[in-house]
Amino acid sequence: MKKLAYFLTAMMLVGCSREFVESIYDINYEPTNRFAKNLAQLPGQFEKDTMALDALINSFSGNIEKRWGSREIKVAGKSNYVKYIDNYLSRSEVDFQKGTIIVETVSPTDPKLHLKNAIITTLLTPDDPAHVDLFSSKSIKLEGRPFLYQQVVDQDNKPIQWSWRANQFADYLIANKLKVKDVDFKKAYYVEIPLVENQVEIRGYKYADIVRRASRKYDIPEDLIYAIIKTESSFNPYAVSWANAYGLMQVVPKTAGRDVFKLVKKRSGEPSPEYLFNPENNIDAGTAYFYILKNRYLKDVEHPLTLEYTMISAYNGGTGGVLNTFNRYDRKRAMRDINSLQPNQVFWALTNKHPKAEARRYLEKVTNYKKDFNSGKT
């Protein structure tokens, strides 16, 4: 998975515009972002990483461009799943925010057969990110309960768990929903499949036991954990981001992950991407980082609601960003200022004056999702 970090870096360095990065990853690309902070902490690492850029671009984005053209490069993100198969001729994209699946192929021979295989693969992809390589065209071993089980229904309004039903639905889609478009001087055959209306809730319910255990273990409210997961990944365990963050709670190995290992797990090193793609590990690590924020970095915040607001903001933009909102030069003065204000005043400052636009939006999103959770919505 080191290739992922190199690839996303490469995309930003070799032609992807600021607007492209912002639109794909929903961030405001500022010098203070988490990715830049990671590089600053590892001054020799960036130079080392860039040595592999050309090879990685040729092996991944180069293969995509060769098949699909430069305007049709799609990669997995925080709230979308993208998987290539069939030597990059076929792919699927699940957009969890839009609630749609697009499965398509540019195979020059037997395109309907290739499309059918891609549809079946998409519908039966297992609910285990460890078995799916998002950054190659390797095939997927279709076993176990599908990741999209109950999030998609067939023409008879039935969930799809078994091969025979996936085959039947694929035939139906190709016979009734097939579309064709031009892609880089070739034809792309595709179908669009809607996710069910409550797809977010279905994914969220899968992690209820894990969230409950993490909440009790670290004394962090369940509604806050759910709100963070929904904000970070839309309950997508395959989530990856430009900031080298992984999984449901988008844990960055070199920062939050390293802190959790050192301060909570009492072990050296940092979690691997494979470790963080495991939902239980990821939720445990993300919640443990909230424990660190609460009991170490922000332990001097006095009001419980103010503490929650500052924790949420710090999870996205760092403790330094929170303190800089109130005083850029004196951290002790910043803490005194925070404690002199009412929680609603702190909330206003963090959503209007925080140095990072992404962090300003983040606090609003999380608090809104918390309200949804407590009103019966996931």
List where the protein language model places each region.
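Substrate-binding/active-site groove segments that recognize
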Residues: 242-269, 284-292, 340-341, 366
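Cell-wall glycan-active module
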Residues: 15-230, 295, 300-301, 328-378
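Short helix-coil transition/hinge motifs at the ends and kinks of transmembrane helices
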Residues: 261-272, 299-304, 333, 337-338
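Secretory-pathway/luminal and periplasmic proteins that interact with or process carbohydrate-rich
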Residues: 233-242, 258, 317-329
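Short, functionally critical alpha-helical segments immediately adjacent to catalytic or ligand/cofactor-binding
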Residues: 219-240, 251-252, 286-287, 311-316, ...
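Sec-dependent signal peptide recognition
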Residues: 2-9
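Active-site metal-coordination segments of metallo-dependent hydrolases
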Residues: 199-202, 273-283, 357-358
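Catalytic and binding regions of secreted/periplasmic enzymes and modules that target cell-wall glycans
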Residues: 282-331
